[in-house]
Amino acid sequence: MGYPVDFEKGELNRGNWKRIKACMKKAEAGEPVKVGFLGGSITQGSLSSTPETCYAYLVYKWWKEKFPQAQIEYINAGIGGTTSQFGVSRVEQHLLQKKPDFILIEFAVNDDNNEFFRETYEGLIRKTYGDASAPAVLLMNNVRYDNGISAEDQHAA
């Protein structure tokens, strides 16, 4: 049943690498680094065979293996069935108050591909990127496994 991957539709915006480089230098120096995740069920790991096989934990594991000298803290604020509208309303309490150094956001499957979710997603990005702790922010877009659809077009607009 799979759906072909349309690499032509995929979008990559490298943006400014300053914050991620600073975060990695902090880890290289052996300083503590907090790695946070915000999203829906994919982030929560609801279809993973174990909590250790969800993408968020695997990214955390990469940080631990890449920077063994640093104390890496894992903060998974994924809640299944939620959208960026709920994400922007809870990001402060569930993630930002913990002062993460690195944040990965994923709502591409639960957000609809329309202007409303473009606005709520943009609000979420502005809130996380504009936080006083200046975290590195990485945005990820997955696709639905049943039909290959995501909100990537709106999120990238």
Please state what every model-predicted region is:
Residues 51-85:
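Mobile, glycine- and charge-enriched loop segments
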Residues 76-78, 108, 141:
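Residue-level recognition of beta-strand->loop/alpha-helix junctions
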Residues 24, 28, 36-38, 44, ...:
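Oxyanion-hole/transition-state-stabilizing segment in secreted/luminal serine hydrolases
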Residues 1-37, 43-50, 60-70, 97, ...:
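N-terminal secretory targeting modules
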Residues 129-138:
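A short helix->loop->beta-strand "cap" motif at the edges of active sites that frequently abuts
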Residues 143-157:
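Substrate-gating cap/lid alpha-helix
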Residues 117-124, 152-155:
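Charged helix-capping and loop-helix junction motifs
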